[in-house]
Design a protein with these regions (language model features):
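NTP-dependent nucleotidyl-transfer catalytic core
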Residues: 1-195
């Protein structure tokens, strides 16, 4: 039986993708056909991988393999969230430092993905390596009115971005409907989220 790569090589070197924003299929046109770059949000490494983590990794792996049959170079980047509230909470519970905890579960995650045949991304940047850049971006959002500070939290104001929800084709109200999580009383809008 021929591999996916062998079967794709007999096809014309054109990839059709679904454009969620325009709700239609179209030919994929990379910004740079000599080096196609793909970014995907990776896991928060505080515990073992779950099916949602694996789904994202498998879908991206298939996409990267397809792109590699068409383009000479593909750079795949998937970030690692190695510090956040869940990691800090698990660190306190297990008495393992956040750094050691996230390192442990990143290794387990990468080994788990390898065991199901998923190739590792070319680059896995860690959130802790970009704290200064995140702070600067958040300050810019505060300064332009897209974020606000309340009760020691910084929240993104979803109503400040007129295109919020366009990709999912859901209004802010539709995204809130059926939400089972108690809304923090300090939020201006229940869909606002912590940065």
């Amino acid at each position: 039986m021929k591999s996916l790569e062998e079967r794709l090589n007999v096809m014309d070197n054109e990839l059709n993708i679904f454009d969620s924003l325009k709700n239609t299929k179209r030919v994929f046109e990379p910004i740079d056909s000599k080096n196609v770059r793909v970014y995907a949000c990776g896991p928060t490494v505080y515990s073992y991988a779950h099916i949602g983590n694996a789904r994202m990794a498998v879908v991206c792996d298939i996409l990267i393999r397809v792109l590699n049959t068409i383009y000479p170079k593909v750079t795949y980047i998937s970030n690692i969230t190695d510090i956040d509230d869940k990691i800090i909470q698990e660190s306190r519970k297990t008495k393992i430092s956040p750094e050691e905890l996230s390192k442990k579960f990143l290794n387990i995650y990468n080994n788990d993905m390898k065991s199901i045949g998923v190739k590792r991304p070319n680059i896995q940047p860690k959130a802790t390596h970009y704290i200064k850049q995140m702070i600067n971006a958040i300050l810019e959002l505060i300064n332009n009115g897209s974020a606000y500070v309340v009760d020691n939290h910084v929240l993104f104001n979803v109503t400040s971005y007129k295109y919020y929800g366009h990709l999912s084709k859901r209004t802010v109200e539709e995204q809130i409907a059926g939400n089972r999580i108690d809304v923090a009383p300090f939020k201006k809008n229940s869909a606002d989220f912590v940065l």
